[in-house]
Amino acid sequence: MTKKRNITAFMIATMIMLFLLPANAQETKGYVHWYEPESEPFGTLTFYGGDMPSGTSLYELNTGKNNPGWLEHMSYCTKVVFDVSFKDVRPTSCYNWFNEFYQLTEIEGIENLNTSEVTDMESMFKGCSKLTSLDVSNFNTANVTKMDGMFQGCSGLNSIDLSNFNTDKVERMGDMFNG
């Protein structure tokens, strides 16, 4: 009888764990929204966490070496916002996220960008020549292997704090600060 109770208890515990595991293991999805006022030639990219609603000017996060869809707005974006809902999103690639966003002057809420699982930051801010400040002190770069061209062409930056950058796994960082 004791053996039967132990088996029953084990099966119940296993079933409870199986039901709880997916709830804890689920990743928060992220998406990007482009907003351009009708009266303005320039607009804002906002990063959100959660399921992507239906509509226009919405983009999924890129993976690997795929260019992000929002690059089509690179010439017209003056502001990027990371909404607080994006804090639970874990992108694996920031490849080309703001490459050649030469009109970009402001990034708001960058502390809501969790980079703990990012492996590629190649050309992330490349060509953002109008940015004068950039706070990347909260970036977790422990898993990053590619940083080449990350700040290339960011000629307007007055200072940047990289003191928390962990470059132990970085294999490529050529032209990281060129230009």
Segments (PLM) and residue ranges:
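Bacterial N-terminal signal peptides
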Residues: 10-19
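Positively charged n-region of N-terminal signal peptides that target proteins for export
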Residues: 1-6
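Sec/Tat signal peptide C-region and signal peptidase I cleavage site
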Residues: 21-25
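Negatively charged
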Residues: 26-179
